UniProtKB/Swiss-Prot annotation:
PROSITE patterns: SSRP (PS01317). It comes from Bacillus velezensis (strain DSM 23117 / BGSC 10A6 / LMG 26770 / FZB42) (Bacillus amyloliquefaciens subsp. plantarum). It is found in: Cytoplasm. SUPFAM superfamilies: Small protein B (SmpB). The keyword Metal-binding does not apply. Its main location: cytoplasm. CDD domains: SmpB. This is SsrA-binding protein. It comes from the Bacteria.
Length: 156
């Protein structure tokens, strides 16, 4: 199964708008019992989340997993820091890459693969405002071309 495949539960659409994604890595995530139940229900927000390397381990910050509705007083903290599981070689490579100016680790999607929750993180370089404008112009032009092609196929 290729990276990023499986049942997608949440996507960080803002990441592709704000960053040039250069590489992606599939990571496992350490969760508590009520967290996985809430994730399976699709109650996850990855909008402002980011990954950070601390003490040689990768952690995911600001990913909001809503408390499980049927949970009791032992429910989890929605914004707690969660550990990501990666191979040591990959972590060492990321340490070197993220020390460069402008690079950061951004979670792209959360999905289930063989019953396990996985997070696809990307090594991204921040976009400037004019880069974002160029992307929007490119998307609009592509949309116009497709619309014209579709109209031509219909027989106009």
């Amino acid at each position: 199964m290729p990276k990023g495949s499986g049942k997608v539960l949440s996507q960080n659409k803002k990441a592709n708008h704000d960053y040039f994604i250069e590489e992606t890595y599939e990571t496992g995530i350490v969760l508590q019992g009520t967290e996985i139940k809430s994730i399976r229900a699709g109650r996850v927000n990855m909008k402002d989340s980011f990954a950070k390397i601390e003490r040689g381990e990768v952690f995911l910050h600001n990913m909001h997993i809503s408390p499980y509705e049927q949970g009791n007083r032992y429910n989890h903290d929605p914004l707690r820091t969660r550990k990501l599981l990666m191979h040591r070689k990959e972590i060492n490579k990321l340490i070197g890459l993220t020390k460069e100016k402008g690079y950061s680790l951004v979670p792209l999607k959360l999905y289930l693969k063989n019953g396990f929750a996985k997070v696809l993180i990307g090594l991204g370089k921040g976009k400037k405002t004019y880069d974002k404008r160029e992307d929007l112009k490119r998307k609009d032009a592509k949309r116009e071309i497709e619309r014209a092609f579709r109209d031509r196929q219909k027989g106009f």
